[in-house]
Amino acid sequence: MPKNELEKIFDNLPTLSYKEKLKSVENYLISLSVDDENIFYDGKRTVYPDFCKYKHTFADKMYIREMSMPRGSTGLSVIQKHSYPFFLLSGCLAATTEEGIQELIAPVYFTSPPGGAQRLVHAIEDCVIVTVHQNPTNTKDLKELEKYLYAFSWEEYEDFVNKKTKDEENK
């Protein structure tokens, strides 16, 4: 069986840790960005590339994101601050984890680890992915919601964890 695209990428970085591999991919994606209009990833915000289609839905204290990802496309997620349910409704998707590369075949769902998850994904087939996230303020402003949900660097994530720990200790 031929290796999927993620295995090819990760095999070229054998001595790096998982986070270092993702950082290397992030740096490469940043280098591909031409300008603010033609951006693949910048490590500072959520990017919704044109090759994917998105549907954003809001329910009471929930944000539901549906993404259609075409076959052959690859994407790097931001760092998730919170655990969330992930549903692959159709297609076949390869996704990196700290344990290795998983091949997910729809229909399948799982709950992400409790924060700090970042994934590199590759659509082996056309995919429809749905994720459900907390939205404690019921905002419909994606930029505001993304500040709550995501970190854009591991340093930012560590600051979030440290602040959360201090807040819990002060209760």
What are these model-derived regions, one by one?
Residues 97-120:
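Short acidic-glycine-tyrosine-enriched beta hairpin
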